[in-house]
């Protein structure tokens, strides 16, 4: 019995020590905006989903203004398959035609968005699900992707259909929600001035939102620990110039390149710091914001 009591006392002591050490960081972020892009493996794991919702609720209860932006690529692919809708790809990128963009909006702004809202509300907070259409928050225009043919070296423009990029962000509605103690949960769907609906990459959408809000932090929850060096070791902090050099020497490659490019653009648009961290680690948001060592790679100007 003594051993059990001693173990319990040790656990409580560690918990108390964590809470005490977290206080300066809570004060640092009080009344600040933190945008969290939620995606990857964590979205498909119910335990991680509940932990994420609890983290977001705790941020709000600590006086921080959290804004959640979510993705949903795997869920969209699953619904398209169930509906018997075949996807066409250009250079590995899905072409979003008129029929598919309707499904995208249904899945992102509907089922996924409301599921996240429900998880946060279950933790005692007041979350509200929105997309770029609500309150004319975000306007998009058609995005074009250019590729270079490896044989002819001729540049070719890909038409990906209703894939867009944000060109205007109005923060008015988000500011009103912050004043109302509400937590916005945003789906990356937005209208164009042409009256069409566009599906936007969730990372890019989160970067645009964070820039418009001049967020203290933009957190990207991914399936990797952060930016790694060539030996596989986590790089804890980088500047824009260091990131550019790591791209040039091949340390940053593949799918990490567009992610860090989004990070750099967000910094140039007024975000103070951007963090790439592992969403598969329970409570990674709290570990990043409320501990000295953080939980991922911090990129600053």
From Swiss-Prot:
Reaction equations catalysed? N-acetyl-L-glutamate + ATP = N-acetyl-L-glutamyl 5-phosphate + ADP
Q: Name one GO molecular function term.
A: ATP binding
Q: Which annotated residues bind substrate?
A: 72-73, 94, 199
Q: Where in the cell is it found?
A: Cytoplasm
User: Gene3D superfamilies, from UniProt?
Assistant: Acetylglutamate kinase-like (3.40.1160.10)
Indicate the annotated site residue(s) for Transition state stabilizer: 37, 259
SUPFAM superfamilies from the xrefs? Answer: Carbamate kinase-like (SSF53633)
Extract one GO BP annotation from the record: arginine biosynthetic process via ornithine
Any idea of its EC number?
2.7.2.8
Instruction: Provide this UniProt record's keywords sorted from A to Z.
Output: Amino-acid biosynthesis, Arginine biosynthesis, ATP-binding, Cytoplasm, Kinase, Nucleotide-binding, Transferase
Q: Which GO terms describe its cellular component?
A: cytoplasm
Q: What pathway does this protein act in?
A: Amino-acid biosynthesis; L-arginine biosynthesis; N(2)-acetyl-L-ornithine from L-glutamate: step 2/4
Family assignment from sequence similarity: Belongs to the acetylglutamate kinase family. ArgB subfamily.
NCBIfam families for this protein: argB
This molecule's function is given as: Catalyzes the ATP-dependent phosphorylation of N-acetyl-L-glutamate.
Query: Could you tell me what this protein is called?
Result: Acetylglutamate kinase
Please name the source species: Bartonella quintana (strain Toulouse) (Rochalimaea quintana)
What taxonomic lineage is listed for the species of origin? Bacteria, Pseudomonadati, Pseudomonadota, Alphaproteobacteria, Hyphomicrobiales
């Amino acid at each position: 019995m003594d051993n059990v009591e001693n173990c319990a006392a040790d656990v409580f002591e560690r918990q108390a020590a964590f809470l005490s050490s977290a206080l300066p960081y809570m004060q640092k972020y009080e009344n600040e905006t933190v945008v969290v892009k939620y995606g990857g493996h964590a979205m498909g794991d119910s335990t991680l989903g509940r932990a994420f919702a609890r983290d977001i609720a705790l941020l709000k209860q600590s006086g921080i203004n959290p804004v959640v932006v979510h993705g949903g690529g795997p869920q969209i692919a699953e619904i398209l398959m169930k509906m018997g809708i075949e996807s066409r790809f250009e250079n590995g990128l899905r072409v979003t035609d008129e029929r598919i963009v309707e499904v995208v909006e249904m899945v992102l702004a509907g089922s996924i968005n409301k599921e996240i809202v429900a998880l946060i509300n279950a933790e005692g907070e007041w979350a509200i699900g929105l997309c770029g259409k609500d309150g004319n928050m975000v306007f998009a225009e058609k995005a074009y992707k250019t590729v270079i043919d490896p044989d002819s070296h001729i540049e070719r423009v890909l038409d990906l259909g209703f894939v867009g990029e944000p060109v205007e962000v109005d923060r008015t509605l988000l500011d009103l929600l912050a004043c109302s103690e509400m937590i916005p949960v945003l789906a990356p769907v937005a209208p164009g001035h042409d009256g069409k609906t566009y599906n936007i990459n969730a990372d890019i959408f989160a970067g645009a939102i964070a820039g418009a809000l001049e967020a203290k932090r933009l957190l990207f929850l991914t399936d990797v620990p952060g930016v790694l060096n060539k030996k596989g070791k986590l790089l804890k902090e980088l500047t824009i110039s260091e990131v550019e050099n790591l791209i040039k020497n091949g340390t940053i490659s593949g799918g990490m390149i567009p992610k860090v490019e989004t990070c750099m653009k967000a910094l140039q648009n007024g975000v103070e710091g951007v963090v790439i961290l592992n969403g598969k680690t329970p409570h990674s948001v709290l570990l990043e914001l409320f501990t000295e060592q953080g939980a991922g790679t911090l990129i600053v100007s």
